[in-house]
């Protein structure tokens, strides 16, 4: 099973025929019909079909698999600087209908939530939530449908948004764990300017609890999805 994300829909691509890389890929048209009488046509390889696995999301960004095997997805609502973002759990995959039976709102009213990541410390699981102006982690337990206890904020970032006179671009914050370190990307405030904040256009390295923060890389316009 392979998953594709297109626009604001999650699409499921299932293979019924093995394709060989050395052979030319033959494409076929497949009509797609979504809720709200939305229709369009996609081209898919012969032997594949494509289907909407989940509908109704606004601006989905990144997936993360939880320790108990569920799929989390961030939704930034739209391209504006807003606090209407949500985190969804896509649960109950139905192999017959090729859809998720349950779409659960895990968190809402978030400030441009671009990405979440899971990490285990001392035998306990945590979910890290990256918003424009802050990074927070929450305890996570199997089967949670909302944070089980208050979160701990471990970092802050420039929060000027699109109204910032220097540009205010790059509202997203991306996360990655490696060798027990957490890496966070903070994009530049503009395409070409002298930055006001040192943290702009960098990747920041820190311990999973937020301690020992340092600049890991500089001069990166926007390392989204690092």
What are these regions (language model features)?
Residues 1-23:
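Bacterial Sec-dependent N-terminal signal peptides
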Residues 22-226:
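Beta-propeller domains with acidic blade repeats across secreted/periplasmic ectodomains
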């Amino acid at each position: 099973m392979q998953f594709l994300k297109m626009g604001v829909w999650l699409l499921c691509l299932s293979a019924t025929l093995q394709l060989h890389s050395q052979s030319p890929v033959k494409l076929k048209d497949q009509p797609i019909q979504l809720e709200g009488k939305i229709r369009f046509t996609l081209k898919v390889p012969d032997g594949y079909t494509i289907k909407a696995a989940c509908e109704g999301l606004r601006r989905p960004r990144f997936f993360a698999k939880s320790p108990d095997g569920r799929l989390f997805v961030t939704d930034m609502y739209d391209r504006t600087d807003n606090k209407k973002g949500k985190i969804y759990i896509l649960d109950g995959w139905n192999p017959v209908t090729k859809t998720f039976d349950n779409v659960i709102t895990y968190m809402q009213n978030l400030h441009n939530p671009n990405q979440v990541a899971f990490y285990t410390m001392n035998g306990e699981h945590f979910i890290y939530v990256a918003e424009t102006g802050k990074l927070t982690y929450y305890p996570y337990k199997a089967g949670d449908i909302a944070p089980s206890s208050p979160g701990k904020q471990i970092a802050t970032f420039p929060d000027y948004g699109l109204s910032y006179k220097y540009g205010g671009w790059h509202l997203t914050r991306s996360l990655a764990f490696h060798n027990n370190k957490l890496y966070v990307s903070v994009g530049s405030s503009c395409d070409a300017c002298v930055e006001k904040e040192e943290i702009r256009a960098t990747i920041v390295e820190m311990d999973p609890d937020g301690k020992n923060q340092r600049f890991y890389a500089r001069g990166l316009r926007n390392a989204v999805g690092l």
